[in-house]
Amino acid sequence: VMEASNNEYNQLFQVAGKPDTIFAHLHHMKYGAQALINKLIFQEFDESSYSGTNRNVDQSILLNEFKRISMTSSIDAIGPSNEHYDAWFHRFCNWKLLLMEKNMPWLISWRYYLLETFLEAMKHVWKSHLLAQSSHGVISLYEVKERTRFHGVIMEVVDPDHDDTFFLPEVQLLVNPGFHLQYSTIKAQVYLLPKIVNFDSHIVIKHRD
């Protein structure tokens, strides 16, 4: 697993306009990076221009595209010479990669190492977009605003080792958006505001009213 340096993370949050972001532990900074990446990836998810170019097509066509790409590998889907080439998916991947490189320049040196993982992740996101666009509003994405009080019905904490003792019940970062389905909800994943910051055993108490 490749990880960014502390300086790269700090630069990332400065560029994103979030220099005051607080993490309870140093390794929690990865959740901040995930939050910023996902914000770019899911931007305009519910719009017809999600691929970077506006398109207005019948919902049945989108459903057929969903079925087709579900049966195609992400690598084959972006290869113009391949039988199952998907021009819209290819355009979507290029558009999101350009956004990420513009906002997170340190990712450029990783692009070839992460390309296959990136494409596979984008395939799942694109499939979700196609399904949502063809569902007549049955499937929709929802986001949780920062400083919102934690609500367990529609949110879950992203860190599997989360300890309520060290956090306020207040959302600091939306890491992964949630989805409303017809009869259920996929919860949004959030990172809460820490009370205590522990970097290399140096404890700093953080209180916010």
PLM segments and residue spans:
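Compact beta-sheet-dominated globular domain cores
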Residues: 115-116, 121-128, 141-209
